[in-house]
Regions:
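Ser/Thr-centric signal marking residues that sit
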Residues: 2, 7, 62-65, 133, ...
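Structural motif
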Residues: 7-9, 35, 215-217
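AMP-dependent adenylate-forming
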Residues: 54-57, 72-269
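Alpha-helix capping/helix-boundary segments
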Residues: 9-11, 38, 122
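Acidic donor-binding helix in nucleotide-sugar-dependent glycosyltransferases
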Residues: 12, 23, 183
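Gly/Ser/Thr-rich phosphate-binding loop
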Residues: 2-5, 15-84, 96
Length: 269
């Protein structure tokens, strides 16, 4: 085995089943991660398991023929602001990236907005969905772009950072909260790469609270909440922390928040 490609959350699953011991994969030469944010904790575990492998962090949606930005994982970490995951780097040849506001104005480095992509690799649109195509593939400054639905920021070095999905940004008791920001601290204080936060319960379409999940059934919920209290404001602290043997993944191999909410609904019933 000389080449590896997967979503980062698969590494967390390998750790859970004790399949990621130091020097477990010495033959690996190239490791590519994509499809979701790459936590630095995953990088550390992978470096120990595959010490001879180069690591690449790729980003890109299906609508842009998948990967269109990349970042080599170097000895010096390049982490996103207020996050524990790696930069997605710069556009590949033939691709362009920018951060835009809701009015589709280009934003300067340091400003948070939606990540937009352009280039020859863009899809023509969605089959039999003209309205959706026009909304997601607008013309900006005379050029066709794709709006990814991802929050992003460009730093002073020109690198892009994906800060999570816009639809994972919720409003709870008047506060705007990014669930991925909680997840970052949850991974750090639990020491577990498999961690996620959901808004639950939902009443009349409005979030009423937060519940966190960690991929370890023996997790000490009280200790985790205490540690979160030391690094997060009160309105971002989950009301409960639940441990599972493993967290559900969707067809893309990403943690499935919808399935976690459905699990909570079943418990409530």
């Amino acid at each position: 085995l000389s080449v590896w490609f997967s979503v980062p959350s698969l590494v967390g699953m390998l750790k859970q089943v004790k399949a990621l011991s130091p020097d477990a994969m010495p033959s690996l030469r190239v490791s590519v991660f994509g499809g979701e944010p790459l936590p630095d904790s995953v990088v550390a575990a992978w470096r120990a398991a595959a010490p001879n492998s180069r690591i690449e962090n790729f980003y890109g949606p299906t609508e842009a023929t998948v990967f269109c930005l990349r970042r080599a994982v170097t000895a010096v970490a390049k982490l996103s602001p207020e996050r524990d995951f790696w930069s997605i780097g710069r556009p590949m040849p033939g691709s362009e990236a920018a951060v835009v506001d809701q009015a589709l104005n280009f934003l300067a480095p340091g400003s948070t907005g939606e990540l937009a992509l352009a280039g020859v690799q863009l899809a023509d649109g969605y089959l039999d969905a003209t309205e959706l195509t026009s909304r997601r593939f607008p013309e900006i400054a005379g050029q066709r772009w794709y709006l990814t639905g991802d929050l992003a920021i460009q730093d002073a070095d020109g690198e892009f950072h994906c800060l999570g999905r816009i639809d994972n940004q919720i409003k709870l008791h008047g506060y705007r909260i990014e669930l991925e920001e909680i997840d970052t601290h949850l991974r750090q204080v639990s020491g577990n790469a498999m961690a996620a936060t959901v808004a639950w319960p939902i009443a009349d379409g409005i979030p009423q609270g937060l519940v966190a999940f960690v991929g370890d059934r023996s997790v000490d919920a009280g200790a985790i909440i205490a540690r979160l209290n030391a690094v997060l404001p009160a309105y971002m602290i989950p009301g409960r922390v639940l441990g599972l043997d493993s967290l559900p993944l969707n067809s893309s191999g990403k943690i499935d928040r919808k399935a976690l909410c459905q699990l909570l609904d079943q418990f409530k019933a």
